[in-house]
Amino acid sequence: MNSSWRVVVFLGLVILCHSRRARACNGGYEMIVHSIENCAGEGQIVTIDPKSTVTLMEDCKVKSKATARTVGFKTAMMDVTITKNGLPVLKETVDICANLEEASGNKEAAEIITMFGVPDHCPVAASEIRTDESQTYSLEKYKQHLLVAQGRSIIDVLVKHDKGESCFKIDMEVTSPNLIG
């Protein structure tokens, strides 16, 4: 999976979370989403219900209960900046529509798109996407990255659409398990 698609998948999972603490796989890592903010104002193209949740279970599976709404769009260029422990670690621009087209040929990406009900192509019609906790996705193959993810991260996402903008600010933290005792 290319790095742009990984960013999209990661943000998709994180954006669905809101103020939840979850014991993660691989010995009890904990993910805490302190806040998610829809920050483009009243005309925001895509919004996420602040009551949406994702639960990271001990068996390295994730399940979600979430609602996202869009007024529809034809284009979506995402600028994402991730700052970890106060230091910038990633700044990338991703053409979401191009990534959706590429994802259709990627079994892993297609599974995530299907699970979360994300449209698989642009243009995207006005819609509401809801997920429930009956579907799960395994993060088993990513658990070795938890040590690298450890610490506080601020994720700033700005998506420029043909009809306006979407903006999300996510404040999250990954803490390590207590290895002593």
Curated annotation (Swiss-Prot):
The keyword Secreted applies. The keyword Transcription regulation does not apply. GO terms for biological process: host-mediated perturbation of symbiont process. Induction: (Microbial infection) Up-regulated in salivary gland following infection with P.berghei sporozoites. Residues 1-24 form the signal peptide. Salivary gland (at protein level). (Microbial infection) Detected with Plasmodium berghei sporozoites isolated from the saliva of infected Anopheles gambiae mosquitoes (at protein level). It is found in: Secreted. One of its GO terms (cellular component) is extracellular region. Keywords: Secreted, Signal. Its main location: secreted. Gene3D superfamilies: Ganglioside GM2 activator. Decreases host neutrophil chemotaxis induced by N-formylmethionine-leucyl-phenylalanine (fMLP). (Microbial infection) Interacts with the surface of Plasmodium berghei sporozoites. Enhances sporozoite gliding activity. Enhances host hepatocyte traversal by sporozoites. Active immunization or antiserum against the protein reduce P.berghei liver burden in mice after exposure to the infected mosquitoes. Individuals in malaria-endemic areas have higher levels of IgG recognizing the protein. This is Sporozoite-associated mosquito saliva protein 1.
